[in-house]
Amino acid sequence: MNVEVRNEARLDIAEGVAFYDRQGYGAGDYFYQRIFEDIDSLSETAGIHETHFGYHRKIASRHPFLIYYRIVAAGVEVVAVLDGRSRPEDIDVLLQRR
């Protein structure tokens, strides 16, 4: 299954990279590599995850991030990659705008 990452989700990932870069040398690169491993795995596992706020939600394997996606005719569309420590109300509002 084809996996497409929307621009908004790419910006979310860039924010995560910037956060981890501030934590220590190489941490941002590690985050980037691991989050894309999780996203790439959706080509095989899309649809098995619970839905939250109208989207499927995959929990990232190595960081406290949540990958929100939907299944579309062309495959999988990742709409957001958000810090799982955020308030659920804030996540809901953000996802309604996407």
Residue ranges and their predicted role:
Residues 1-32:
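Arg/Lys-rich, positively charged N-terminal/basic patches that mediate binding to nucleic acids
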Residues 18, 27-30, 50, 54, ...:
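Solvent-exposed interaction patches of small proteins and small membrane subunits
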Residues 36-37, 41-76:
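Basic/aromatic recognition patch in beta-strand/loop cores that engages polyanionic ligands
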Residues 66, 70-98:
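Enriched for short, Lys/Arg-rich terminal
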